[in-house]
A protein has these predicted regions:
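Conserved catalytic-site region of short-chain dehydrogenase/reductase
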Residues: 16-18
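Active-site loop immediately N-terminal to the catalytic Tyr-X3-Lys motif
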Residues: 20-24
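Active-site helix of classical SDR
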Residues: 29
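Short-chain dehydrogenase/reductase
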Residues: 33, 37, 86
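A transmembrane-helix-recognition feature enriched in membrane-embedded lipid enzymes
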Residues: 96-131
Length: 131
């Protein structure tokens, strides 16, 4: 802030926008990161420092194995490569965007979570984490 310029990149998740069955703490934590980033972005407005929250969906990293998610539809059908996610994050950071959702499928997922009732999105989330 003292320099009048800076960039902050926080890592959220599409799980910030809708429930993650069997992983509620993860979803709640990522919702916090998204909300915190938004608040910080507004607090720093006019200082030259921007805050970006990158919200990827399923990404081909060691996380899926450690979280026991490799067998789920989410990681079988909708996984992105980490390089592609990183490129989205870098571009959003460079442009000073507040949030960035990586991938078309993930963007549609986030839009559906914003516009559809939980009675629709919750079963979708459950379907994605089932085998």
């Amino acid at each position: 802030v003292q320099r009048g310029y800076g960039r902050i990149l926080n890592i959220g998740s599409t799980g910030a926008y809708m429930p993650c069955p069997h992983d509620a703490v993860y979803a709640a934590t990522k919702a916090y990161v998204l909300s915190f980033s938004s608040g910080l972005c507004h607090e720093l407005k006019g200082t030259g420092v921007t805050v970006t929250c990158l919200c990827p969906g399923a990404t081909q990293t060691q996380f899926a194995g450690k979280a026991n998610l490799l067998h789920t539809r989410l990681f079988k059908l909708f996984v992105m490569q980490p390089e592609a996610v990183a490129a989205v994050g870098y571009e959003a950071l460079r442009r000073g965007k507040q949030t960035a959702v990586a991938g078309l499928y993930n963007k549609l997922l986030v839009l559906s979570a914003k516009w559809l009732p939980a009675s629709v999105t919750n079963p979708i989330a459950q379907w994605m984490v089932n085998i």
